[in-house]
Design a protein with these regions (language model features):
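Minor-groove-contacting beta-hairpin "wing" of winged helix-turn-helix DNA-binding domains
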Residues: 382-386
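Local cysteine-cluster metal-coordination motifs and their immediate loop/turn environment
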Residues: 25-38
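Short amphipathic alpha-helical interaction segments
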Residues: 357-371
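A short, conserved structural fragment
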Residues: 371-381
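Short, amphipathic alpha-helical interaction segments positioned at domain boundaries
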Residues: 388-407
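Glycine-biased, low-complexity coil/linker segments
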Residues: 15-17
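C-terminal scaffold of the Radical SAM
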Residues: 6, 19-21, 40-64, 68, ...
Length: 407
């Protein structure tokens, strides 16, 4: 019952406020992981210049909000920041002073709620004892650590910058100074047995981290992993292995008190990610830095994924982004995807209220085969994947998308 109350109150508290999130993309990494297709550079030459440009964009985006408030007479001027998230890339390549400088810039230009969640993504090789102590005295109150695996062979195959010993050592240290810690683990890795995957999870549990994000290894175009597979040097990931690992993950974590609140995310009570949940619950967010995305409820924008072009635009006092106005179908499809992936599901009354009866009828019709196959279920007017359907959620969602609709 306690978990049930927390799940509903968590969503209500986020949805009931008019604020949003700020995401800051730090586009630098020490080396390129083989599977990664996010935007980053392994050259640190422009790091200091980038930090200053990001600070300037924070001011420019606030000015944009103020302009919107004046022209549209909406509440943009009073928009409060509830979470700040440093992602990348590898944000832990910044010095603590640089991180604190950017946080101070957020506070300077925006209204920030009391005790906001402030997350730093970090790699184990950056988290020495000295750095962890330093961060624990900073404004950062949540760490998201890219462990990925506790096995040397997996880390080598992924071309991670840390080794297995560093993965364990950083958690041993981090848990002494931070309560709110999330780690990333990757499953479906070629050659990884069910027993090894179980051991990865058990190792994470031993350190007592309260949040785990876990993703299947995917092969993206233009990555080193894709090239290695095409050359036959690495075996391609198998769906059946990923599904077996997913089931082990869900069963093990739920047995150990974790709530499976989003397809790839598991949290103990009081440790759900407020930042990511803001995205999933349809709240507004501002993305700062190269390749960062923003959403205001009506439109989506994205910054140029090129460090040099980003810096040039900011120097010329131009926001380096493109924008699209979302159609009703776009917003419906997004809600279907995020809703099905979360524990809160898709509320049928919200579909009718926000999108109309045509969309509701379409959703009910498209869902019928999945309900019949026990992959989806409707309870209390909420559409959700069943345990049997969870692993297939993304594919199911795409079949429920509204297409060929003339606005």
């Amino acid at each position: 019952m306690a978990s049930s109350n927390y799940i509903s109150s968590f969503a209500s508290s986020l949805s009931g406020r008019s604020g949003g999130a700020i995401y800051i993309h730090i586009p630098f990494c020490k080396q390129a992981c083989h599977y990664c297709d996010f935007h980053f550079s392994t050259s640190m030459k422009k790091k200091e210049e980038m930090v200053l440009a990001i600070a300037k964009e924070l001011q420019m985006r606030k000015n944009e909000l103020l302009d919107c408030a004046r022209s549209d007479k909406n509440d943009a001027e009073f928009w409060e920041v509830e979470t700040i998230y440093f992602g990348g890339g590898t944000p832990s390549v910044l010095t603590t002073e640089e991180i604190e400088f950017l946080i101070a810039e957020v506070y300077h230009h925006y209204n920030v709620v009391e005790n906001p969640e402030i997350t730093l993504e970090a790699n184990p090789d950056d988290l020495t004892r000295e750095r962890i102590v330093e961060l624990s005295k900073s404004s950062i109150n949540r760490l998201s650590i890219g462990i990925q695996s506790f096995f040397e062979a997996d880390l080598a195959m992924m071309n991670r910058a840390h080794n297995a010993a560093e993965a364990q050592k950083c958690l041993e240290l981090a848990t002494q100074y931070f309560d709110n810690i999330s780690i990333d683990l990757i499953y479906g890795v070629p050659g990884m047995s069910n027993a090894q995957w179980q051991q990865n999870i058990e190792t994470a549990l031993r350190f007592g981290v309260p949040h785990i994000s876990s993703y299947a290894l995917t092969v993206e175009p233009k990555t080193a992993l894709n090239t290695l597979i095409q050359k036959g040097k690495i075996e391609a990931p198998k769906d059946e292995v990923a599904e077996a690992h997913f089931q082990i993950l869900v069963e093990t974590l739920e047995k150990n008190g974790f709530i499976h609140y989003e397809l790839s995310n598991f949290g103990k009570e009081n440790y759900f990610s407020k930042n990511n949940s803001a995205y999933w619950l349809g709240k507004k967010y501002i993305g700062i830095g190269p390749s960062a995305h923003s959403y205001d409820g009506i439109s989506r924008s994205w910054n140029v994924a090129n460090n040099a072009l980003y810096l040039k635009a900011i120097q010329q006092n131009q926001l380096p982004n493109e924008k699209e106005i979302l159609s009703t179908a776009d917003r419906y499809n997004e809600y279907i995807m995020t809703g099905l992936r979360t524990i809160w599901g898709v509320a049928l009354d919200r579909i009718e209220r926000e999108f109309g009866l045509d969309y509701l009828d379409y959703l009910i019709k498209q869902s019928e085969k999945f309900v019949k196959d026990e992959l989806l279920a409707i309870e209390n007017n909420i559409l959700k994947p069943t345990s049997k359907g969870k692993f297939l959620t993304d594919g199911i969602a795409s079949d429920l998308f509204y297409i060929n609709l003339e606005e």
